[in-house]
Amino acid sequence: MANKKYEIRYLPTFISQFNNILYYITYELKNKIAADNFYNEVVKQIEIISNAPESYEVYKTIKDEKIKYYKINVKNYTIFYVVKDNIMEIRRIYYSARNFDNLI
């Protein structure tokens, strides 16, 4: 049986956070090549997981969430997403060393 491809939806919060990270790498660290590589890697990994997003790690939050969050790591960052029907909703991206419990 073929894997079902999920529609990818990026929430504005994720887009804003991702743009801030890319800006930081490009202008603060002065490394446009690293920013481009990071952008490409994030997009690639999201495309890959969209084939089977529910097979990735579930994030166990301390909050009583009714929504099941999944997470993937790309370089030093963690991306959080949820799955609703045939939609994979990309919600947040954080530096992996952060404590996520109060953020998700």
Regions found by a protein language model. Name each.
Residues 47-73:
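A short, surface-exposed loop/turn module that caps and links secondary-structure elements
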Residues 25, 32, 36, 53-60, ...:
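Secondary-structure transition/capping residues
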